[in-house]
A protein has these predicted regions:
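Conserved ABC ATPase "signature" region
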Residues: 19, 35-55
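Catalytic Walker B motif of ABC-type/P-loop ATPase nucleotide-binding domains
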Residues: 91-95
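ABC ATPase nucleotide-binding domain "signature motif"
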Residues: 49, 55-78, 102
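Hydrophobic anchor residue at the start of the ABC signature
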Residues: 80-81, 108
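A short, proline-enriched helix->beta-strand linker immediately N-terminal to the Walker B motif
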Residues: 84-89
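Q-loop/switch helix immediately C-terminal to the Walker
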Residues: 5, 10-27, 39
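Helical segment within the ABC ATPase nucleotide-binding domain
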Residues: 105-120
Length: 187
């Protein structure tokens, strides 16, 4: 589980952070130090963090410029790496794009989509207001309203349901935004 707020040690480097997680989550009886280091290096490369491996994570509230720490997108990728180090079959992320600019958010979601595909892993994201470009990376969506499932399936299926319900949807409209606005207006 990757929470919305990054909980990282600011004085550790990226590599030290991932190695610390490896020491905690990978039993020494099954993994030698060299295997843990290899896993850390591989994960840093996969997450696009190899170039900042020796940089301190920093404190986002103190290091507002990235000279003393990582950018928001890099911090989020480190948080994801902390959870991926033990290779879980399912990864849950709460608002992984929160606080990121649109480019960094798209990069995170694209990376997660690639991981899901390449590693045959189930990745579940909660995102309150995903952009259309982010939605292109989703295989399936679960739309909830007041604790009830409104839709579970693809965007195409959601559009079909809306049209069947009598909605006239213009071609340039983001289907998910339309559905969310429709749900919110029917409160």
């Amino acid at each position: 589980y990757v929470p919305q707020s990054d909980a990282l040690f600011p004085l550790l480097t990226v590599k030290e952070t991932l190695l610390f997680s490896a020491h905690i989550r990978l039993p020494s009886s099954a993994f030698k130090l060299s295997e843990k280091l290899e896993r850390v290096e591989s994960l840093m490369a996969e997450l696009g963090l190899a170039h900042v491996g020796n940089r301190r994570v920093g404190n986002v509230h103190v290091d507002m410029d990235t000279r003393g720490g990582l950018s928001g997108g890099e911090r989020r990728r480190v948080s994801i790496g902390v959870e991926l180090i033990h290779d879980p079959p399912v990864l849950l992320l709460d608002e992984p794009t929160s606080g990121l600019d649109s480019s960094a958010a798209l990069k995170i979601v694209g990376m997660l989509h690639s991981m899901a595909k390449n590693r045959s892993r189930t990745i579940v994201l909660s995102i309150h207001q995903p952009s259309y470009r982010i939605m292109e990376h989703m295989n399936s969506i679960l739309l909830l309203a007041r604790g009830h499932v409104v839709h579970h399936g693809t965007l195409e299926q959601l559009q079909w349901k809306l049209v069947q319900a009598g909605h006239q949807i213009e071609p340039q409209v983001n289907i998910l935004e339309y559905a969310i606005e429709d749900i919110m207006s029917s409160k």
